[in-house]
């Protein structure tokens, strides 16, 4: 199996004081122990930089750009970075068009499309509800809450 690591996981891994830090860490370590493929996409790394450098007062981590770059480099070394390919846009377009995905969820739909194009079978996220209804869109992806790993 292979697992796509969502931005919500990276944010918790980066913040040791977050109440879900331990859950995220244990889930990733367990998947690694099992020999599962662990992947991120450029979109997730971009979203991570957004959250990491955003002030704490507006739901960010409040990290410096230097600290953010160090963490991003660690994540890029730990997780396989899936390439952007021309097949992602048509897969995303089919998903949002068929399911009528709108608003902020179009970004989540793109992550599902990345999983489809790269044959990633599972998506690890704290935001399971964001992917409701999209996971079953063929070829499908299993959305996994880290507490269940």
Task: Show where each model-derived region lies.
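Hydrophobic helix-cap positions at the C-terminus of alpha-helices
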Residues: 30-31, 75, 95, 99, ...
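Acidic, PIN/NYN-like endoribonuclease modules and their adjacent C-terminal/linker elements
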Residues: 2, 109-149
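Short, well-structured N-terminal submotif of metal-dependent ribonuclease cores
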Residues: 1-40, 57-66, 70, 133, ...
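Conserved glycosyltransferase catalytic-site signature
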Residues: 7, 42, 105-109
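Active-site-proximal, substrate-binding regions of enzyme catalytic domains
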Residues: 52-80, 86-88, 92
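Active-site neighborhoods of divalent-metal-dependent phosphate/nucleic-acid chemistry enzymes
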Residues: 80-128
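Short beta-strand segments at enzyme active-site cores
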Residues: 39-42, 125
């Amino acid at each position: 199996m292979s697992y796509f690591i969502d931005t919500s996981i990276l944010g918790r891994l980066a913040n040791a004081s977050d109440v879900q830090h331990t859950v995220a860490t244990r889930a990733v370590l367990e998947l690694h122990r099992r020999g599962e493929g662990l992947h991120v996409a450029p979109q997730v790394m971009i979203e991570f930089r957004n959250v990491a450098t955003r002030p704490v007062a507006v739901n960010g981590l409040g990290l410096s750009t230097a600290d953010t770059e160090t963490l991003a480099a660690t994540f890029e070394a730990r997780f396989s970075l899936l390439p952007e390919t021309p097949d992602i846009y048509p897969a995303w377009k089919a998903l949002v068009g068929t399911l009528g995905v709108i608003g902020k969820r179009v970004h989540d739909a793109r992550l599902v499309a990345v999983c489809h194009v790269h044959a990633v079978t599972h998506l690890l996220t704290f935001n399971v509800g964001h992917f409701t209804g999209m996971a079953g869109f063929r070829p499908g992806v299993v959305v996994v809450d880290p507490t269940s790993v």
